[in-house]
Amino acid sequence: MKSLKQIVYSWVDKKFLGGCSNYNSLSTRKSCRSKKQAREMFSQNAIPHAKGEIFWGFVKPFLFAKKYGFPIVVKPNVSGFSRGSHFPINNYTQLLKAIVLVKIWWPSSVIEQYLKGENYRVVVVKNEIMSVIRRYPPFVIGDGNSSIEELIDRENDLREKMALYPVIHPIGKNLRTVRFLKKSNLCFTSIPSKGEMVTLYNRVALAPGGIIETLDKDSMHEQNRELFLKIIPYFNANILGIDAIFEKGIDFPYTDQRVIFLEVNSRPYLKMHHYPRYGKKQELSHFYDVLNRLEIQQKDIF
């Protein structure tokens, strides 16, 4: 069984974690490998988080939706980069479809309450915030003259000029985008009004063209800073990428708004912090100097 697990996680590492950092021990990585583990730790330490459950079959998610209502999110228990996630789910038909599709990624799945707000990745090292980014789904801004397709081409050209590829991806002009636009009665030939933001997909992941904005760490409210720093000792980690949604924003105290801490990443993808579409490129070399000097136990064992 042990060798089988090593084979599985080795495959996951090569297939899905290419380019991810590796500064935590095996015991730390094991302690936050699944979303369930993170949620349990959040619950034990009064960290605001979404109510959620692990499920294998079809009954439990429907009972969860009946108890807590919509919107909700369904995602694999073990995953990253928003792979296999489905949200916002607003009715039972969408829920059934999500239950079927989520099993493509992992046999055990998560159903949670969904919060609409600002999505952040905060990278924390011991006693210090390393980097703060806000993540957006792919979007374009109308100029009153250009079609959505033209705006996408312009945005992709700009990303290429900014040398964001291949870390940041181009926005796809594919069936997925067509279907998403159709939900808003839009298509590639539609012409948005000047200043109108047109969202092209619902996920903040990089693969469909998600957008990264770096933020000044000092813009984070002090209460929020203390909350993020509080988390890393719970996992005995050297570094964590912590994902959270703030209803108003990270510059407002978490006590004055709805906040959901989603998960912790023991191998955060740090490359994206160096290729922002918006905000300043961050200087993080002194953090890497410290991290690279660490002796990591069982670094290459999964």
Q: Predicted regions: what is each one?
A:
Residues 1-17, 31-32, 195-202:
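Short, composition-biased local secondary-structure segments
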Residues 11-172, 221-225:
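Active-site nucleotide/adenylate-binding loops and adjacent lid/helix of ATP-dependent enzymes
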Residues 148-183, 280-302:
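Active-site "cap" helix and flanking loop/linker of ATP-utilizing ligase/carboxylase catalytic domains
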